[in-house]
Swiss-Prot record:
Residues 93-112, 203-214, 255-274, 383-402, 412-429 have a biased composition (Low complexity). Sequence repeats lie at residues 9-31, 49-62, 72-94, 95-108, 115-128, 135-148, 149-162, 170-192, 193-206, 213-226, 234-256, 257-270, 277-290, 298-320, 321-334, 341-354, 362-384, 385-398, 405-418, 428-441, 452-469. Belongs to the plant dehydrin family. This is Cold shock protein CS66. Residues 233-254, 302-312, 361-382, 451-469 have a biased composition (Basic and acidic residues). Induction: Specifically induced by cold temperatures.
Amino acid sequence: MDHQAHGAGEKKGIMEKIKEKLPGGHGDHKETAGAHGHAGTVTHGAPATGGAYGQEGHTGTTGTGLHGAHAGEKKGVMENIKDKLPGGHADHQQTGGTYGQQGHTGTATHGTLATGGTYGQQGHTGTAMHGTPATNGTYGEHGHTGTATGGSYGEQRHTGVTGTGTHDIGEKKSLMENIKEKLPGGHGDNQQTAGTYGQQGHFATGTHGTPATGGTYGEQGHAGVTGTGTHGTGEKKGLMENIKDKLPGGHGDHQQTGGTYGQQGHTGAATHGTPAGGGTYEQHGHTGMTGTGTHGTGGKKGVMENIKDKLPGGHSDNQQTGGAYEQQGHTGAATHGTPASGGTYEQHGHTGMTGTGTHGTGEKKAVMENIKDKLPGGHGDHQQTGGAYGQQGHTGTATHGTPAGGGTYEQHGNTGMTGTETHGTTATGGTHGQHGHTGTTGTGTHGTDGVGEKKSLMDKIKDKLPGQH
């Protein structure tokens, strides 16, 4: 641990020394330090057994937070952990903020770690916070746990992570960006410009229940995540955008213009129960999600748009301009019961979702438009002009019971969605087409005040189904 490290200069962190010589680790990183730098890390527990032809069996790390470390140039904990993994190449530029940019703490592992696989980076154990969380520094980011990987030829079976969030001023990368950015196949140039006086970062996430079982040749079986949202002013990525931004096949150009007076970010999502079993060659078996919505002013993406925006086959250019004084965002969705089993060659078996609607003023997408906007086959450019002082949005949907069984070569087995609920057994999907959709009901829109053009609930449900453009 580095406690009360004083003075300026350039030095290497503990994790940088550990990871510096691992195979295939290449990366150029630039950081301009703020004040009160990053804490060191330690490892606990039995390391995993290595496999073959790859880097396997790395244990997690723990840190105590930040303790009066003064200015200088050094790397963060998560950057050091993931910086040298095979296939991870990226150029990063960060410009420090003011008044206390503090670094990220590490993670802790407890118990027996996983056994490595072959021909790739496998067998990294997840880390969990059991007992005493990391010790606070000053306005620092602490208590983040790691992730677990396993399977073959791809990044599979990642569990969620938990944390308490970040509290400081200045520009930094979110937790999920640090976790996903250096995994095999993750390449990206990231540039962030710091805000001032209160740009607070993204909260961590967590999973509940049994994560999904990964398939092959793709990223499958990711469990849901939970979070409480972000708070502050400035331009930043949403939680789900960070999670999905680097998935295979996920391409998109996004432009966001920040608002003023409290642009607060997106909440995470959570899964309960047993997630669906993954299929093959695509991303399958994603469970539903819940969230509390977003509050604040400025341009931002909805929760569901962030979730679906980067799925394989989903390509879009999204432009949003923030409103003013109370643009409140979209609520998430939740699934209960047993999700559907995934099919093959497409995205199948998605369960229904619930939400409470949107409230506020400004330009935003409705809940159902966000849900259906990026499904395979659904392509469209959307432009909406926000109303003023009270355009209240559409209610979400919920499904209960047994979802339909997925078909093949298309998107099948989607359960019906209602403004209120659906009960009973849904239809069984067929083949080579979109089959088995149950009927939908809606309650309409309530309390629409002000000026603006918007679609009804049922239009949003039906507008973006595959084959309808």
